[in-house]
Every structure is written in structure tokens, then in C-alpha cells.
Swiss-Prot record:
GO annotation (BP), single: negative regulation of cell differentiation
PANTHER family the UniProt entry points to: LEUCINE-RICH REPEAT-CONTAINING PROTEIN 14B, SIMILAR TO PREFERENTIALLY EXPRESSED ANTIGEN IN MELANOMA-LIKE 3
Chain positions of LRR repeats: 103-140, 191-215, 244-279, 280-304, 305-336, 337-355, 361-388, 389-413
Source organism: Danio rerio (Zebrafish)
The keyword Amino-acid biosynthesis is annotated on this UniProt entry: no
Protein's name in the database: Leucine-rich repeat-containing protein 14B
Keywords: Leucine-rich repeat, Repeat
Annotated InterPro entries: LRR_dom_sf, PRAME, PRAME_domain
Sequence similarity: Belongs to the PRAME family. LRRC14 subfamily.
Gene name for this UniProt entry: lrrc14b
Length: 526
């Protein structure tokens, strides 16, 4: 329930021009509550003025918009474009304009706490996603420098220095403005600090240049994804030339590591990469989905001296030898999040799979086993392996050929144990598809199921949880993938880049065919 203090703040920010005129009369300790009230009601003009005259040393969106004693509503999942644009322009004017009420003591602005979600709670329904926030903030930094150089700022602007912490997203479309802002960072009052960085649709040359620019920021999270053609030799250069002492999370694009591409001279490359990663002493999360690591997992992970807590090995083609190492490794006793999707664990390494879950049972929170060939006969392996994992919160088993009867058994097990469980990705039961289908399902077959039968099965399964007091557990079936705000925001650019890459491949293939044809014709003429 909102306090009287917050209700008063709401009433004040909605008085329009009067609120802006009377802002200078307010005590500095009212600014945080007014910030949340104006954000909640999308009072953009007032929000701009509030930021422009901010009297405190910190402006942290997670703290300001999260649950508070005055207002329990969590606004961190609202990336309202209207409010965030007002916030960023207000930050620019904080630097450029002379102070009228309080001294300029702002030291840190933290934008990391807001989350991009599929359904916006703001009234305008227009979002400013991570990519757009990155572009706008870097433009604000650049515009601030231009205004100062043109003499369009107060003298106090040259004495301002504010660290601006951001979880950035850079693609080819915003690369130029981002790199320009980073180059001017030492001269700009707004000191950009990329705590996290996601990179997509970028050439290797631009990627390495960008990473060099942010190296001094000490990023904690680096995601190189999708349309960045990064391979093992490039990763070796990246890790050997750049220093990221605070890096905690590292993501590589699909097929960045592929042991089948390694020549005889590169057979030791995985060990070299492991040794380079061992220098990242804070590394706790490693995402390698859709790489090919067959027989090389030990080389890659054994040099690490600090245990990984999150690892994605989905569709990495690991074999029994890899799993034997992993189940007995330093990492196995510290895993919080594990994804082994795409591996038929019951056929390839049932005993070591059980051992792995036994060793990480005290820490494991999330387990991904999508398309692992788990059918009714192999369900016992899963339930036995999960038995010691009392802290499990998430279970993802899409794409497994389990019937409704088997899922009833599984949900009874989940309902009677696992007190922390909160999220289950439920596969469409095998008996909801035609009898002739084979697994893994192709995209066309995937959505061709008996929806009425599925809804009935789902209702029964959710009912099992509800009867045991677990109605709060989210049960979903995202057949086309879980919503990804970053992909959704940049899907057009990603599609164009992928089409361009496809055209280049086809063009090269056609050139090769034409060359071969010309050679054959030349031989025939001879």
C-alpha cells in the first residue's frame, strides 16, 4: 500500500506547470520519492527538471524505481520511452545549465537496474530498449561535448564529473556514435562506463576496436552474439590482447568454438583458450551454446582455477569423455545454472549425468534439458537425478517426447518436493501429436498438435501443483522461444545482416560453380 507521503508526491507531480515552478522550494530528501511518482505517472517535463536539478550524489534507477516502503510497486520493468528520454536529456542539462537551487554534487548515475520485458506497464506503451538507450545516452554525451565546445554551457559544466553506468548494446547501426562518445570520454563530464556489453551484427575489426575502447571500464559482462563471425583464433587474440580483470560473464556466438575446424597445428588451441580464460579470475558464467566441443571440454575448462557457477553447453556435442571430466571437475560442486540441452543424457552418459547433479545438488537453481530424448522409459533417470536438488527453481524440458501420463508422474514429483520451484517449461505431450512424428521435431511439425488435448493436459498438470500449494509456479510452453527483448529490438538489423551473409555465401558458391564449369569446358575444348 502506498504511504500518505507517496500519495502527496503523486498529487504534487500532477499539478503541471505549478510543480515545475515550485520545485526549487522542495527539500533535497524529497527528490527520490518525487522521481518515482513522476515516472509512474509519466510526467516527463517534471522528471526532466527533477534530474536537471538533482541534489544528491547518486541517481540509481534500481533503487529509485524498485519496491520501496512508500510505494511497493516495482517500476524497474518499465522502460518507458517518454520517461527515459526525459531522464537522459535532464542529465545533459544538469551538466550544461547553471545550478539554481542546490550545488552540483552528483557523482554516479546507474542505469543498470531497469529490465526490458515483453509487456510494458507504462501508459504510453512505447519503450526505449537497451540498444536505443545505448544510442541515446552516447548521443547525449556527444551533444554535451559539442555544446561545451561551442560555449553554450555554464562555466560550472567544466567542473562536473559523473560516472554513468550502463549495460550497453552495440550493433553496426549505432557503432559510430558509440565509438565517438567513447573516444571523447576523457574530455566529457559524463563518463560512460559499460558495466555490461552486448555486441551483435558487427565486423571483427569494429568489435576489437570497441573492446579496446571499453577495456578500461572493467566490464563485468560481455556477450558476443549471433551475427558476429567470431572463431577460436579470434578469441585467442581477444583474450591475449585485452585485459578484463572484473569480467564475470562471457558469451560466445554459435559455432565460435568448433573443434572440427581445427587443423593439426591448432589441436592445442582449446587448452590455450582455457589458460587465457584462467586469467579472468572473476569469471563465473560461460555461455557456449551451439559450439562443437566433442572431446575437448577438459582442455577448455580444466585450466580455470575459479569454479564456474553458470555454464551453457546446449547443443555442444559433448561426449561421454567430456561428461566424465565435467562431473568430477572443480566446477561441478558450484553450479547454479546448467544447460545440457540437445544431448541425449540417458543414452550417452546416464551415470555421469546422475553424478553431476548429485555433486551440484546443494547449489543448482536452474536446469535446461531441452530436446534430450527423454521419453517415458527414461523419465525415471531424470526424477532420480533430480532427487537431491532441493533448491531447484527452474526446469526446462521442452522438446522431449514425454506423454501426458509421464508428465503427470513428473509433476507429482515436482509438487511433493522442490519448495523453491517457480518456473517450468512444459513440453507439448507426445500424445498431442500424430503418432507418425519423430523427434526432434522440425519447425513445421512443432506447432501442428491437438491444441484442445494440450490445454486439457496442461490444466491437469497445473492442478497437480495447485493442490500441493504451488499455484505460484509459472508453467509455460514457449515453442518458438522465450521472448528476447534485445533480439526483438534489433530484429530488422539482424535479419538484414543474416540475409547479407547468406547472399555472400551463395555468391561465393555460384562463383565456385562457374569456375569449375569453365575449367571443364576448357578441358573439353582441348
Amino acid at each position: 500500500m502506498k504511504t500518505l507521503k507517496f500519495l502527496s508526491a503523486e498529487a504534487f507531480v500532477q499539478t503541471g506547470p505549478n510543480a515545475r515552478r515550485n520545485l526549487h522550494c522542495l527539500s533535497y530528501n524529497l527528490y527520490p520519492i518525487l522521481f518515482k511518482a513522476s515516472y509512474l505517472h509519466e510526467e516527463a517535463s517534471f522528471l526532466h527538471d527533477l534530474v536537471q536539478t538533482w541534489p544528491l550524489t547518486e541517481l540509481n534507477l534500481r533503487k529509485l524505481l524498485g519496491k520501496t516502503t512508500d510505494c511497493p510497486e516495482d517500476l524497474t520493468c518499465s522502460t518507458c520511452r517518454l520517461c527515459l528520454e526525459a531522464f537522459l536529456t535532464g542529465l545533459r542539462d544538469y551538466v550544461l545549465q547553471a545550478s539554481t537551487t542546490y550545488a552540483k554534487i552528483l557523482q554516479v548515475v546507474d542505469l543498470i537496474g531497469i529490465r526490458d520485458t515483453e509487456h510494458q506497464i507504462c501508459q504510453c506503451r512505447r519503450t526505449l530498449g537497451r540498444w536505443a538507450r545505448t544510442e541515446m545516452l552516447t548521443r547525449v554525451c556527444y551533444e554535451t561535448m559539442v555544446s561545451m565546445q561551442a560555449g553554450q554551457s555554464a562555466p560550472s559544466a567544466f567542473n562536473v564529473e559523473v560516472d554513468v553506468r550502463l549495460d550497453a548494446f552495440v550493433t553496426g547501426r549505432n557503432y559510430e556514435v558509440v565509438s565517438q562518445a567513447l573516444l571523447l570520454r576523457r574530455h566529457c563530464p559524463l563518463k560512460l562506463q559499460f558495466v555490461g556489453l552486448r555486441v551483435d551484427s558487427l565486423s571483427l575489426r569494429n568489435l576489437f576496436y570497441l573492446l579496446k575502447l571499453v577495456e578500461s571500464h572493467g566490464p563485468q559482462k560481455l556477450e558476443v552474439v549471433h551475427n558476429v563471425h567470431l572463431e577460436a583464433p579470434h578469441i585467442e587474440v581477444m583474450l591475449s590482447q585485452l585485459k578484463f580483470p572484473r569480467l564475470r560473464s562471457l558469451t560466445f556466438p554459435a559455432q565460435a568454438l568448433n573443434v572440427h575446424r581445427l587443423g593439426l597445428e591448432d589441436q592445442d588451441l582449446m587448452r590455450v583458450l582455457g589458460e587465457l580464460m584462467s586469467k579472468l579470475t572473476e569469471l563465473r558464467e560461460l555461455y557456449l551454446g551451439f559450439s562443437t566441443l566433442t572431446g575437448h571440454l577438459r582442455k577448455l575448462l580444466s585450466p580455470l582455477n575459479t569454479p564456474l557457477e553458470c555454464i551453457e553447453l546446449a547443443n555442444c556435442s559433448i561426449n561421454a569423455l567430456d561428461m566424465a571430466y565435467f562431473a568430477n571437475s572443480l566446477h561441478s560442486e558450484h553450479l547454479v545454472k546448467l544447460d545440457l540441452s540437445g544431448h541425449e543424457v540417458a543414452d550417452l552418459f546416464p551415470n555421469t549425468f546422475r553424478k553431476l547433479l548429485q555433486r551440484c545438488s546443494s547449489t543448482l537453481i536452474s536446469l535446461g534439458l531441452e530436446e534430450c530424448g527423454l521419453d517415458d522409459e527414461k523419465l525415471d533417470l531424470l526424477t532420480q537425478a533430480l532427487t537431491p536438488c532441493h533448491g531447484l527453481q527452474e526446469l526446462k524440458i521442452l522438446g522431449n517426447p514425454l506423454t501426458s501420463a509421464a508428465l503427470h508422474r513428473l509433476f507429482n514429483t515436482l509438487a511433493n518436493a522442490y519448495p523453491a520451484l517457480r518456473y517450468v517449461e512444459l513440453p507439448v505431450p507426445r500424445d498431442c501429436y500424430p503418432e507418425s512424428v519423430t523427434y526432434p521435431l522440425d519447425d513445421r511439425t512443432l506447432v501442428n498438435y491437438d491444441s484442445d488435448k494440450f490445454q486439457q493436459a496442461r490444466t491437469e498438470l497445473v492442478g497437480i501443483l495447485e493442490r500441493e500449494g504451488k499455484g505460484h509456479v509459472e508453467v509455460c510452453t514457449p515453442l518458438l522461444g522465450v521472448y528476447d527483448a534485445d533480439i526483438n529490438e534489433t530484429s530488422n538489423e539482424l535479419g538484414v545482416s543474416m540475409l547479407s551473409s547468406f547472399n555472400n555465401v551463395i555468391g561465393s558458391f555460384i562463383d565456385t560453380v562457374n569456375t569449375v564449369t569453365q575449367r571443364r569446358e576448357h578441358r573439353l575444348m582441348e
